[in-house]
């Protein structure tokens, strides 16, 4: 859990993982908030955080401008409200694309919908730069519900399974939905790729040679063993900064693993 050290075309990336407790009937935690920094609770030592929320965890209204926000929620829920009138709840595998363009005010709160059991949340938020000519375009917004998120299953050379969910770009012949029209990802020459990969134990997965200028990052976010990337052992919650002009072989250890891939030309 925490920020990802990534660079252009990405402005920022954050992985939130919170083991939220049972809800209190009002979408907040059924636990004391004593000792937490009210309105600014980011302590990485805790199992969960309130962030800027005071009763419900999350990020109340705040502005964005000049970039695209990609929010991926594999587990838990997010409630979105914005100044353009869009609102809704998404999660459990859904993805939101939002071009902030000339400016938008929005909030994203993390409702604890279950009062009878814990409410774990996993969320990736990625800020992708907009082309200079598109920075002041009208804000735009698209939901990719989990049933519409392009997905494929493949066998590696040993018959082990690789599951690929493609948010932007194309992997193994699985192509994403159309990006937002003013996105950096709208030009295929920018080689923007965002995908979530689930690897069976002892699986091998290969990333192709694309270009010498492309940035490529792999975050190992969930798993009990290590992942080998060109003989380097990646531990859980570690991020690898890889070459874009090399074929990269990723070899999983002896338990299932989940990785996030981010690619793109600066």
State where each predicted segment sits.
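Jelly-roll (double-stranded beta-helix
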Residues: 1-266
């Amino acid at each position: 859990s925490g920020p990802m050290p990534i660079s252009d075309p990405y402005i920022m990336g954050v992985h939130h993982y919170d083991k939220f407790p049972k809800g209190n009937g009002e979408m907040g935690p059924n636990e004391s908030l004593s000792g937490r920094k009210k309105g600014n609770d980011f302590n990485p030592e805790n199992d969960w955080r309130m962030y800027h929320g005071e009763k419900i965890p999350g990020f109340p209204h705040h502005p964005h401008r000049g970039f695209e926000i990609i929010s991926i929620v594999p587990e838990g829920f997010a409630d979105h409200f914005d100044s353009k009138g869009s609102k809704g709840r998404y999660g459990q595998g859904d993805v939101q694309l939002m071009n902030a363009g000339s400016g938008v005010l929005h909030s994203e709160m993390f409702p604890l919908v279950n009062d009878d059991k814990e409410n774990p949340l996993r969320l990736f938020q990625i800020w992708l730069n907009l082309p200079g000519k598109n920075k002041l375009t009208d804000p735009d917004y698209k939901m990719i519900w989990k049933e519409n998120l392009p997905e494929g299953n493949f066998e590696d050379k040993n018959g082990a399974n690789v599951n690929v969910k493609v948010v932007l770009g194309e992997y193994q012949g699985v192509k994403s939905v159309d990006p937002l029209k003013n996105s950096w990802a709208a030009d295929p020459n920018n080689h923007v790729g965002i995908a979530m990969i689930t690897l069976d134990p002892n699986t091998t997965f290969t990333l192709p040679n694309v270009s010498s200028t492309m940035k490529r990052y792999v975050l190992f976010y969930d798993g009990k063993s290590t992942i080998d990337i060109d003989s380097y052992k990646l531990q859980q919650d570690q991020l690898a900064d890889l070459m874009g002009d090399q074929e990269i072989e990723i070899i999983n250890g002896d338990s299932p693993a989940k990785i996030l891939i981010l690619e793109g030309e600066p």
